[in-house]
Amino acid sequence: MSNVRYTSNLTRETYALILAGGRGSRLHELTDWRAKPALYFGGKFRIIDFPLSNCINSGIRRVGVVTQYKSHSLIRHVMRGWGHFKKELGESVEILPASQRYSENWYQGTADAVFQNIDIIRHELPKYVMVLSGDHVYRMDYAGLLAAHAESGADMTVSCLEVPIAEAAGSFGVMEVDEEMRILGFEEKPQQPKHSPGNPEMCLASMGNYLFNTEFLFDQLKKDALNESSDRDFGKDIIPAIIEKHNVFAYPFKSAFPNEQAYWRDVGTLDSFWQANMELLSPTPALNLYDAKWPIWTFQEQLPPAKFVFDDDDRRGMALDSIVSGGCIISGATVRRSVLFNEVRVCSYSLVEDSVVLPDVVVLRHCKIKNAILDRGCIIPEGMVIGYNHDHDRAKGFRVSEKGVTLVTRDMLGLPVGYE
């Protein structure tokens, strides 16, 4: 099946800016050495691959990736996996690190991150600027957002989705809209969100994806830069300041294809990160990584196929209901309902269940592991038991999440740190 995507005048006139500088502090030690957008997901990808793939699949070929916090692995990944675009054809994916272009400060907020790159955006001469969050895993055709923005005559359009009020409280920007989806009110991360029309248990939450007419965006950023009391944030400052006098609309998040449920996940906690990976193991997952109509692009390492060795009664190498990536060796061990990233080795007589195992992990013999996240490069000592007794896990120095997922990192195992 062909997966060629075609550009339109709207996408051709659009420059996308992905904000990828966040740490993701609720992921604790998992982001000690990498920015959240550089975090692994789905067996072989990183979170940044999803908004980037959405851009390419939507026909948007000019993209800037804004980086700040511990960005080395993110920059390296984007350069390796996304450097094949042809500038002479108007295609590019560029890295935009914090570089104190307009002041001695680093990026102070989401709006400031865009403001400090105005000269780079202006050089591209876009009619529209799309500002995207690099923190979420989702599949979205931005062409629909562009079409709705142009048709409505909006100055700014905010992508939104309905989420439970309890989930949105303190975590999402929440908006009020009229019957035409014009935004009438906006609060950034309220503790008591206002509910959606006709649905007292749900609210309309911002996805952190914004579309602007370029000159309108520049005008608002310049005004905000002169406001000494501003937090330099789109949700806290820019949107509340413009909704009364300008055309600001909401765009409901939709699937990239008709008759399919839209997929969006906030993987900002250990539990949500673990759960989103576990969902991929379903026979018909909400996010189908095997859909050729909407491929997820990434850096393709040259690795040998996964291998499963030994077939004795007491030592059988096998994986059931799992994702096992390139370079993995399951040597006389059992893996069930788990996601194994590249070059993981599970040695004889070990059992790994319901776990997310990041690249380069080695599980030595006679280990028992369940409901765990093993960070990149961990070497699990022979005979270690993880996830069966939370008190014992904590005594070993591991972190146990609210819902009982155990995080293990190299530092917790006394190994040299710095894996990204």
Swiss-Prot record:
Q: Would the keyword Nucleotide-binding turn up in this protein's UniProt record?
A: yes
From the UniProt record, give the pathway where this protein acts: Glycan biosynthesis; glycogen biosynthesis
Which CDD domains does the annotation name?
ADP_Glucose_PP, LbH_G1P_AT_C
- List UniProt keywords, sorted A-Z: ATP-binding, Carbohydrate metabolism, Glycogen biosynthesis, Glycogen metabolism, Nucleotide-binding, Nucleotidyltransferase, Transferase
Q: Which GO terms describe its molecular function?
A: ATP binding; glucose-1-phosphate adenylyltransferase activity
EC numbers on record: 2.7.7.27
Q: Which reaction does it catalyse?
A: alpha-D-glucose 1-phosphate + ATP + H(+) = ADP-alpha-D-glucose + diphosphate
The record, for Pfam families, names: Hexapep_GlmU (PF24894), NTP_transferase (PF00483)
Tell me the residue numbers annotated for binding alpha-D-glucose 1-phosphate: 107, 173, 188-189, 206
InterPro entries documented for this protein: ADP-Glc_PPase, ADP_Glu_pyroP_CS, GlgC_bac, GlmU/GlgC-like_hexapep, NTP_transferase_dom, Nucleotide-diphossugar_trans, Trimer_LpxA-like_sf
UniProt record, GO biological process: glycogen biosynthetic process
> What is the similarity comment for this entry?
Belongs to the bacterial/plant glucose-1-phosphate adenylyltransferase family.
Free-text function comment from the UniProt entry: Involved in the biosynthesis of ADP-glucose, a building block required for the elongation reactions to produce glycogen. Catalyzes the reaction between ATP and alpha-D-glucose 1-phosphate (G1P) to produce pyrophosphate and ADP-Glc.
Assembly and partners are described as:
Homotetramer.
For this entry, the protein name equals Glucose-1-phosphate adenylyltransferase
Gene designation: glgC
